[in-house]
């Protein structure tokens, strides 16, 4: 669900968020900063957003499970990716948190090779993390790549012609083409070593082997692990999931809620400066439930103030919490199902998408519903924090809120405007002034709209959206559902009963595994995360030029998609207004890519 510099050198642009964080301070408050001796031990309890719960443990995520609860709040706690992006108050490659040294990149004969040396990490069973563990993950990925959330045809792993083990700590990947070194990290950052010496099995009772070295064997191993992954009730007891190289091990899990408890991995080889010994991650059904718990029990160490309750921050700080916004590097959107038989032909008309975008009052929503804790989305590259990846054109809003412009667009293309009802196509056809290809006479602008419940700000956005659309004669039938349900539904679907508009209310973060904001998994016609089946040959062509085209190619790509509207752009909410126990240290500054670092947290007396 997340993101992706350009230069021939291996220097990665790390964007400081100083201006961003300074801007957030004006909207934040905090309790007096507690100081005192460090406490050894203790438990930190984290509150997740409503409906976001841990329900996928295998580090080969499917798109519908690519959520914060399954990545930053579980997978990354237990298994570390090869390269880590983000850090306290910054984006970009984090060499300290990465489990491999920067890649040595060479080009020969039109092909790029990355040679990688692993740092001396160990699994929790004492065995070293080796090149074979990386190869194991890679082989399993190839065995079931179509289900992997990061898959785009022709990109990783299709573009790897050779994986060579040089030594237990060194390996190389040769790619079929020439890549910019920094873009290459988009590919390399997706690699996650997993314990071949413990997981390379075809059944629970079978021996560990080297089955993954053949395609047929890799499929069997993947099938076995996928079956184990589906058994949520055994997440905390299955010996497979106890072999980790991350800083935390799962000790307790409630399958019905996704609540999880972790303890420190004593064998963790990476940086860890904190002192807490355990971590609890809790799911909530609504903002109200979380906020009531935060105020009443004091049992939450790291929670949030709902946007709708932003004015109540004083109550939280008086209870000893420090409060600060958590801006994130991402984009937010409403997805359109271009393949829906009833309405796909309508969504394929650019003027319809332009009219809809003109009816979305992003500035108004940020002010009224997010209370200033958000930023607009104008295209496929985040506006905040400012970075060299953002073109000067995409800093401007190509479709500002303008209901009259929306009505004019629809009327000019053959629609009878019915304010408060549903506009009707009265001029079918394919000329510039007709409704467009595939739209019949009498067809109406009436759509089902699925959205995630539980977050009051999202509910208010959707209600305002429905009202604005209605005034222009676009009828929305709202269908609220839990966050996990809405995310799971946002996949390709071509039946008449399928979803039409889908809004899960949270942003697409350019993390994990990305160094610059290449959205190919979302916008390429073969991208596995292209749930709406958007298909634009020009977009595909521009995306194909990103690996070797540098920043000019990235700018051309984003400027095109900003105006083409493969999705409807919505405000990017801050991750949350964080509320942290005043005695819990090491949390701030927060990571714009949504990662957490509880191994560095500690309490003071």
Per-segment meaning from a language model:
Residues 60-62, 580-605:
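Tryptophan-rich aromatic "cage" segments
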